């Protein structure tokens, strides 16, 4: 099925979920490319463009021997509001990050929060225009974020 055959809601939901899949796979280049023409807001930090986001994630995320962060981002409660006339949309969702690291960390939730997104339609396809990431809680991030490992 071509992208244009999918409803706007479905195309946008696919972008939201693709973000999780690419991050969990450790595919930082394609992860960053989701934001080639978009802002990525994390706390006080605002970055624009895929390479800047790829570099940020690469500098903060622990990548394990299998080439992944050994995580599963679970995105839920997705609420999408589309303005077809103006080719724009907004979405809100919640996320939880599960992680396990064999012999290091049992399966657990290492973080959770909210995404607030804006999308724009260009060339008959939907793209991120802005993603704001809010962290509401964290767990044991020693094997998820660089600089968190204890001695």
Task: State where each predicted segment sits.
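Short, cysteine-centered beta-strand-loop-beta hairpins and adjacent loop/turn segments enriched
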Residues: 98-108, 138-139
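A solvent-exposed, acidic/Ser-Thr-rich amphipathic alpha-helical stretch
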Residues: 28-96
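Short beta-strand edge/turn micro-motifs at domain boundaries
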Residues: 88-90, 112-143
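Short, low-complexity N-terminal intrinsically disordered segments enriched in polar/charged residues
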Residues: 1-33
